[in-house]
């Protein structure tokens, strides 16, 4: 049968797949594919009424509030549950629509099949192996990455906050961009946002640069041929990185508090106590210093490996040309190390930007700042969001801040990666 005859014969069958998914495939003896498409449609139709009801709930967020009559509580609509269920229903509809389109395309491209059912299973497994393997990861990504992001975005357009809009006691309403306007228009909120943003940038930049620099110094020192006990020193320097960060931060908090061992020692030698964690400037310097202590060993190992990849011929040639040690470092060592670790620096900056543990476990965002709204002097965005949600239930503003952080970090990371020579070299390979 030639192609023209096949098209003429298959043309009347195509409309079947517009009404019954898999109809064309089943009529052409593709029992496996046709059965899968048909089963998906049956499942979707069985739950269609529930899906429609859930989608309506996404737009209304509920109409009946909880009612209390004495000791009796009559439950109403839970707006947040309805929002989450509505998002899930929307994703299901989107996946079904995608499957429906794939069904139509497959129906147009399929000819008559002469394989047995077992052979069809084997062929489907061979042809769609990558799709089958990636499907669980794809669904997991939707559930654990896409779904939370979408919900966060939607919450930012609601009034989900204490004390008057916390389900199930109260309903939540859509408010548009009111929360975004409030964050930047109201002085108490805008001052807090700008203050926390400034400190977050200072913290992320200083923590990244100082950690990298200190690790670089350690790696260069241990790379010297005349240094004694290099292996022992390397082991000692690695210990802060080997100890769990959670434990290290709590130990430093214990050591540096007002009545901790460090201040007790200072008092014993006749010196005054130092408010490491209770004075704003001291607290900021302390959290950066502790971050350097924890992170420098990692960069030491990373840079030590990068140094071994630099050819000694470059240094020998530069010595012949009369280059000094500083010129060798400036023109050879530093550029070649940065070329290898630049992507890691960007990721470290993004990590420090959201480094919840380093701030919260040491200072809990303190000391308190009376000029800020629900934030302290050392709070960064992520710890401020934590307080807004867990302590004060201001979910609407927390969602707005989360969106801003997500957009900023995404843009910065993409821009930096695309500008890096290492990224361009990889793309050109």
Mark where each language-model region is.
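Membrane-interface segments at the starts/ends of alpha-helical transmembrane spans
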Residues: 64-91, 185-198, 280, 391-392
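N-terminal, membrane-interfacial amphipathic/helix-forming hydrophobic leader that caps
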Residues: 41, 51, 56-64, 75-82
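N-terminal signal-anchor/first transmembrane alpha helix
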Residues: 2-13, 19-27, 31-34, 38-46, ...
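A structural signal for multi-pass alpha-helical bundles of membrane permease subunits
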Residues: 49-58, 133-429
């Amino acid at each position: 049968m030639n192609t023209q005859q096949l098209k003429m014969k298959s043309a009347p069958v195509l409309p079947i797949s517009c009404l019954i998914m898999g109809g064309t495939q089943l009529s052409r003896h593709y029992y496996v594919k046709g059965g899968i498409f048909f089963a998906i449609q049956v499942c979707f139709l069985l739950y269609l009424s529930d899906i429609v009801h859930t989608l309506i709930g996404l737009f209304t967020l509920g109409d009946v509030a909880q009612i209390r009559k004495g000791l009796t509580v009559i439950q109403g609509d839970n707006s947040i549950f309805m929002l989450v269920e509505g998002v899930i229903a929307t994703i299901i509809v989107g996946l079904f629509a995608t499957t429906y389109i794939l069904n139509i395309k497959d129906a147009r491209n399929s000819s008559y099949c002469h394989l047995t059912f077992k052979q069809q299973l084997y062929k489907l497994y061979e042809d769609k192996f990558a799709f089958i393997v990636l499907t669980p990861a794809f669904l997991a990504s939707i559930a654990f990455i896409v779904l939370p992001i979408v919900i966060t975005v939607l919450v930012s357009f609601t009034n989900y906050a204490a004390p008057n809009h916390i389900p199930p006691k109260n309903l939540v309403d859509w408010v548009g961009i009111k929360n975004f306007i409030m964050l930047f228009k109201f002085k108490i909120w805008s001052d807090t946002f700008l203050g926390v943003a400034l400190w977050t940038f200072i913290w992320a930049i200083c923590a990244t640069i100082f950690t990298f620099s200190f690790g670089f110094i350690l790696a260069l020192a241990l790379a010297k041929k005349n240094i004694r006990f290099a292996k022992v020193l390397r082991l000692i320097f690695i210990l802060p990185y080997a100890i769990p960060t959670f434990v290290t931060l709590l130990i430093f908090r214990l050591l540096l508090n007002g009545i901790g061992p460090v201040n007790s020692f200072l008092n014993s030698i006749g010196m005054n106590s130092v408010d490491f964690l209770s004075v704003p400037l001291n607290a900021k310097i302390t959290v950066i210093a502790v971050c350097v202590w924890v992170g420098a060993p990692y960069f030491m190992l990373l840079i030590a490996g990068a140094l071994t990849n630099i050819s000694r011929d470059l240094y020998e040639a530069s010595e012949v040309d009369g280059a000094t040690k500083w010129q060798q470092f400036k023109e050879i060592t530093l550029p070649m190390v940065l070329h290898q670790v630049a992507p890691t620096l960007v990721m470290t900056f993004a990590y420090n930007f959201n480094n919840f543990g380093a701030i919260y476990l040491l200072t809990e965002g303190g000391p308190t700042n009376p000029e800020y709204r629900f934030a302290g002097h050392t709070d960064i965005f992520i710890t401020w969001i934590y307080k807004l949600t867990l302590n004060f239930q201001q979910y609407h503003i927390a969602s707005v801040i989360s969106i801003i952080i997500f957009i900023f970090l995404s843009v910065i990371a993409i821009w930096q990666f695309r500008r890096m020579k290492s990224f361009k070299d990889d793309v050109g390979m």
